[in-house]
């Protein structure tokens, strides 16, 4: 009898985006890689903070422009509770100011929505613990 090979657990991903269809598209992209597992969806920044604390994902995909609190504020709050959190900011903006604000908030990386399909999985694998 052979010993079972220890397969690494999947990378647990939380999606925080207020556009339901875009969130579903993100999940479809992530489903193409067996190493990634979506563990929750948040529709606003406040819900993202609550879910991040309760499900403790490996990586959080955080939209910047969301209701209640934006992605920058949600990132700051999550980092206060979970300093080790790996958060990738997602946005349609290529603004240098937004990139700087994302880093200041504690984001591990930044992916523009026009490059999601090409870069998202690589970005997750790069920042995941």
Task: Give names to the regions the model predicted.
Residues 50, 72-84:
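Short amphipathic alpha-helix used as the core "switch/output" element in two-component signaling
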Residues 97, 115-128:
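C-terminal output helix
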Residues 44-47, 69-73:
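Acidic catalytic/metal-coordinating carboxylates
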Residues 66:
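Receiver (REC) domain active-site loop signature in two-component systems and cognate sites
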Residues 93-94:
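Short, conserved "switch-loop" micro-motifs in signal-transduction and mechanochemical regulators
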Residues 55-61:
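Active-site beta3 strand of CheY-like receiver
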């Amino acid at each position: 009898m052979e010993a079972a090979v220890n397969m690494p657990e999947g990378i647990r991903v939380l999606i925080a985006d207020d556009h339901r269809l875009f969130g579903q598209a993100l999940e479809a992209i992530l489903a193409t890689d067996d190493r990634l597992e979506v563990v929750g969806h948040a529709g606003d920044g406040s819900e993202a903070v609550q879910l991040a604390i309760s499900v403790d994902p490996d990586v959080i995909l955080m939209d910047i422009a969301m209701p209640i609190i934006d992605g920058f504020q949600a990132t700051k709050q999550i980092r206060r509770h979970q300093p080790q959190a790996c958060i990738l900011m997602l946005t349609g903006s290529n603004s240098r100011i937004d990139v700087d604000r994302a880093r200041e908030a504690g984001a591990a990386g930044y992916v523009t929505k026009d490059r999601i399909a090409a870069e998202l999985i690589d970005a997750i694998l790069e920042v995941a613990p």
